[in-house]
């Protein structure tokens, strides 16, 4: 008797469903395995790229930053120093969020921000800087360096002057507000021929300089000499005075020529207005302090500063070198130290 065996029959639709289910389960398992592997990886500090013109498209390793200490002038010095030293050493530079909050509302700065959450995960090597350039700073070791100190010296960054001026370009609305104010000024009914920004640093320095640093702040005589220097050299100058001691300025600056305007608001917590006014002038009279130094540096033109304002044995001279703070072409007028000698 002939027996014919029929092949096992399995519906095609069921077969397709079976294959799809198995494939899906396999794919999900693979994805879960990858995610688990990523979770198990240790946290890595990124290697960051830079568009540094000096180094071209090469990758720059590590991360350099600087402590944000002090007010506007200090933080401008810290920013410019970080910018220059990082470029000199071929490292990417990042600024603290605090520094960004101080500078970004005023200037078109370009360095990226290092937020605190990221900074706390990095094994920093603290590196103290003097307030002047040292040869050893050209070859600073370490990939993750955080600078400390109060650097504010042209010796760090003057070779990059045009780049620094670009970094500290005022935002349009800040510049335009200052220029609008200056356009409205007159000298004895006529438009000024030259604008001279005057910054008079007082505030805490009035007490700190004589009591801590064996020094003085600018007095009436110094300011009179500085104003007369410009009056003798320029036709119809106008002096735009800013200060954190405006009441003292009104009492001690001679206004009999009709060429002095007390323009600044002197608010230390929001210095943009005063700083913008100074930098939109043609020349600068400063007294002491980094605010005035930076105003003069960005303005260009002629600059007069208070010179020799401490006694020779002042501890201030251990952390401050006048020749590293004031450009060689600026003109200093010696301070009157007699009030210190009386005591």
UniProtKB/Swiss-Prot annotation:
Keyword Lipid metabolism in annotation: yes
Lumenal side: 29-343
Side of membrane Cytoplasmic, spans: 1-14
GO BP term (any one): protein glycosylation
Top EC class for this record: transferase
Glycosylated residue positions: 188, 282, 308
Reaction catalysis annotation: a beta-D-galactosyl-(1->3)-N-acetyl-beta-D-glucosaminyl derivative + GDP-beta-L-fucose = an alpha-L-Fuc-(1->2)-beta-D-Gal-(1->3)-beta-D-GlcNAc derivative + GDP + H(+); a beta-D-galactosyl-(1->4)-N-acetyl-beta-D-glucosaminyl derivative + GDP-beta-L-fucose = an alpha-L-Fuc-(1->2)-beta-D-Gal-(1->4)-beta-D-GlcNAc derivative + GDP + H(+); a neolactoside nLc4Cer + GDP-beta-L-fucose = a neolactoside IV(2)-alpha-Fuc-nLc4Cer + GDP + H(+); a neolactoside nLc4Cer(d18:1(4E)) + GDP-beta-L-fucose = a neolactoside IV(2)-alpha-Fuc-nLc4Cer(d18:1(4E)) + GDP + H(+)
GO MF annotation terms: alpha-(1,2)-fucosyltransferase activity; galactoside 2-alpha-L-fucosyltransferase activity
Keyword DNA-binding belongs to the record: no
Keywords per UniProt: Glycoprotein, Glycosyltransferase, Golgi apparatus, Lipid metabolism, Membrane, Signal-anchor, Transferase, Transmembrane, Transmembrane helix
Record EC number: 2.4.1.69, 2.4.1.344
Parts of the chain that traverse the membrane: 15-28
Localization per Swiss-Prot or TrEMBL: Golgi apparatus, Golgi stack membrane
CDD domains: Fut1_Fut2_like (cd11301)
Coiled-coil zones: none
Membrane topology designation: Single-pass type II membrane protein
Gene Ontology cellular component list: Golgi cisterna membrane
Pfam families, per database record: Glyco_transf_11
Pathway where this protein functions: Protein modification; protein glycosylation
Protein family (similarity comment): Belongs to the glycosyltransferase 11 family.
Protein purpose: Catalyzes the transfer of L-fucose, from a guanosine diphosphate-beta-L-fucose, to the terminal galactose on both O- and N-linked glycans chains of cell surface glycoproteins and glycolipids and the resulting epitope regulates several processes such as cell-cell interaction including host-microbe interaction, cell surface expression and cell proliferation. Preferentially fucosylates gangliosides GA1 and GM1 in the antrum, cecum and colon and in the female reproductive organs.
Protein name in UniProt: Galactoside alpha-(1,2)-fucosyltransferase 2
Organism: Pan troglodytes
Lineage: Eukaryota, Metazoa, Chordata, Craniata, Vertebrata
Protein encoded by which gene: FUT2
